[in-house]
Amino acid sequence: PAGSSCSPLLLTPSRSSLQWPPPAVASATSRPSTTPRPASKDSSTQASPPSRPSSATRRITLARAHDEDRFAIPVIDLAGVTTGSSRRAELVAEVKAAVKTVGFFQVVNHGVPGTVMSEMLAALRSFNEEPAEARRPYYSRDGQSRVRYHSNFDLFRSPAAIWRDTLYLDMAPTGPSPEEIPPACRGIAVEFTREVQRLGGTLFELLSEALGLHRGFLEQREAGCLEGLSVVGHYYPASPQPQLTMGTSRHTDPSFLTVLLQDSVGGLQVLHRLRRDDQPVWVDVPAEPGAFTVNVGDFLQLLSNDRFRSVEHRVLSKSVGPRVSVACFFRPHGAAAAARVCAPILVGDGAASPPRYRSATVEDLIVHYRDKALDGTSMLDHYRI
């Protein structure tokens, strides 16, 4: 990619549909006429991104300095999560407030060793900066492959190419063999996955309690929130003209929960509605050292019956970099999960509320998410009652 020390992966992608993840939801209000071109990221392929709207587009603006002074992404200290009922009750309340109002929060003192976090980021950077010939064997758009690498996963649906290369590792419930994982990532990927699964278990316990349910509810078979895990490494080269492209277009996540590790470059933004003028603005999510960023996905918003929020977010291109991040998606996986029915949870704190969504199988949800393409609406709108 341009701006990095490696050569671009100049391959012609096939048109096989990527079954996971489905295309991200993005705004269709300002579609450029430029047709995206695969892989090559020189300035001639860049188009004015649909995710940088004018002031007239949905009245969304970048957060101004005084707005940022009034708002920050919640940071939750998980120290003491396993000790004492009073501290745990405080943590449940903090998580509940974050997912109800913002949909995003960061966690510190989460128990994942700093060495594991830094080694995972370094491994992904090393892989992406290998010669194209070394990366070529992993190039795939086959959603059934447990290891795949490419640029622009929604290339044939998006109105503009994005400035990013991605390595997908589907690690659970059945992960790839060590030989399938690129050598640069092979040693650390399994250890990192194990740590993230443990952290995910803690988070789903807190979220279950935030719904007024027993702490194992979201992990149990009926919900299955912890069964599937995709570890997705993104590499964003420095862009010579960052105003002409996006690192990742605005979208929501087709997951139960996303746990993100990012380096210090920054660029992640979340769309948040400030109280004062009731207008949504893009707010920076800082690259807090040693922290994971956590956000609610569409599946969990449906299960929670709108008590938890899945919100739009994006990544800006930067003139510095590369930016490296690891997004860990807890999501449905496999044939058994495809037949599972997703429906609002109407027990616990939600017992008195009518359902806000129709029931649907996981397969129906994923197919709709993929087939609806980038029409500027949320997947959940189709199922809302």
Regions from the PLM with identified roles:
Residues 2-160, 164-166, 175-176, 181-385:
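C-terminal flanking tails of non-heme Fe-dependent oxygenases
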